A protein has these predicted regions:
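A cross-family "folded-core" feature that marks the main globular domain of proteins
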Residues: 1-168
Length: 168
């Protein structure tokens, strides 16, 4: 995918099936090029049949977001879907219920950056004398962070030109 979101190696190799499924899904979200099944197999230290079983689960998971794992002969696999779907999936797979940012391979300072964005949002809201629930500020900061990361690499959301903004 992108140089910075070219994920650093994860801290540890996943052991269980669900951990591998999440790892593979996150890996595919991070890449904007093909990766071979053999490369994944070597990264995860699993057999071909184990990887095939995990990939079935990965496909099911990503389909929930409107994303598809596509295969190209002699190239490997990669994700296909709209930029909006990719961003939504990233937000849900990298942001945990406990409020912690899961390190995406290559993001490095995600949690720190999101906290900085939150502080900016809070200070602007305070200046305008507006208050928002903490969860809303956190979600907005996360979406801004993802958008900034994706835009740096020319991954922009396309809008339908037929949509009109109503002015009241």
């Amino acid at each position: 995918l992108m140089a910075q979101m070219q994920y650093e190696r994860f801290d540890r190799i996943p052991d269980t099936g669900p951990e591998r499924v999440e790892y593979i899904a996150r890996k595919l979200l991070a890449l904007d090029y093909y990766i071979t099944m053999e490369e994944l197999r070597q990264i995860l230290y699993v057999s071909r049949s184990t990887l095939n079983q995990d990939m079935r689960q990965v496909r099911r998971l990503l389909e929930l977001y409107g994303l598809k794992v596509v295969h190209a002969s002699h190239k490997g696999i990669r994700l296909q879907g709209t930029e909006t779907a990719l961003r939504r999936c990233m937000a849900e797979l990298f942001f945990r219920d406990d409020g912690k940012w899961e390190k995406a391979p290559g993001t490095g300072h995600g949690e720190e950056r999101i906290s900085q964005i939150q502080q900016i949002l809070k200070s602007r809201a305070d200046a305008l004398r507006v208050s928002y629930p903490e969860a809303v500020v956190r979600e907005l900061a996360l979406q801004i962070y993802i958008a900034a990361q994706r835009c740096r690499f020319r991954k922009e959301v396309e809008f339908d030109s037929s949509l009109q903004v109503s002015r009241r």
